[in-house]
Amino acid sequence: MLSIVDNRTFKRLTYRVLDHDPTHVDITAFFRRFHAALTARGLTVKGITTDGSALYPGPIAAVFGEIPHQLCTFHVIREVTKAVLSAVAQERKRLAATSPKLPRGRPGTKVARRAVRRKEAIKRKVGELFDHRYLFVRRRLSPSQRATLRRITRGRPQLRRLRELMEEVYRLFDRRCRMGTALAKLATLRARLRRSCRLRSVLKKLMSPGLEKALVFLDERLMGATSNAVERGNRRYRKMQDAVYRVRTKRAIEDRLALDLLRESQAQGRASTTKALHKARAA
């Protein structure tokens, strides 16, 4: 299902339901139909936000020309957070592998008792890293959460560097800075990653050449940073398809989308009517 949604009002503007995976031809035809509808009304597209799919750049340039094209920041941050959590999991495995193997029976010697204490300490450390793993990727941490993070990363500087890098990634997408400032921060971050083989292999997404497109919204104040408006509407239909068998066909989805567009066009009139009825009833 292809959809174009106004990122300011979160209203669906046009749609097309396909019975196959979309191709460049489908995307181009979809954009041309939308462009023709805008031209007939004297409107133009000033910018567009999409996910990171390779299907969009070619058709956008062919139909709309040179317009600002923003990649959804949510998808970029999601890939980075997944990589950071994976790195934390690898560190847990490395830490668990250092746990000493104990012989059977009660520890009778001082060395054996020391090994038991070390094994329990490592097990406790691994458990804490698992229980509090999301502290490494949260956007904002409270003072108590920061204290917990310092405690569980004590003696593990590589884990603290992961959290520092995550904070730098969030600062890249701060609306208070301009795109030029963000690009300078990104260049500094990439240089730092090149000096660390382990971090470079973990955060490959930050080295991708198309990441700059995720920072376009910093200079375009009216442009949405994410494509959540489209995904929220599509998610509603995916959820509906799980429960209502009739909505799974192409024809049923088209009819349901058309009905939703009709309801949205009449929403303001319904609100005015409801307000007038409440006012008359209260009089």
What are these model-predicted stretches?
Residues 14, 76, 245-246:
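A generic structural signal for short coil/turn motifs at secondary-structure boundaries
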Residues 21-22, 90, 244-246:
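A short hydrophobic/aromatic micro-motif that marks alpha-helical segments and, especially, helix-coil
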Residues 1-49, 54-66, 87, 229:
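RNase H-like nuclease fold core
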Residues 32, 88-92, 108, 262-265:
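Short alpha-helix boundary/capping motifs
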Residues 51-54, 59-104:
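Conserved beta-strand -> loop -> alpha-helix junction used to position metal-binding or nucleic-acid-contacting
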Residues 20, 24, 35, 69, ...:
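Histidine (H) residue identity feature
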Residues 39, 43, 50-57, 64, ...:
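Acidic/histidine-rich catalytic cores and adjacent linkers
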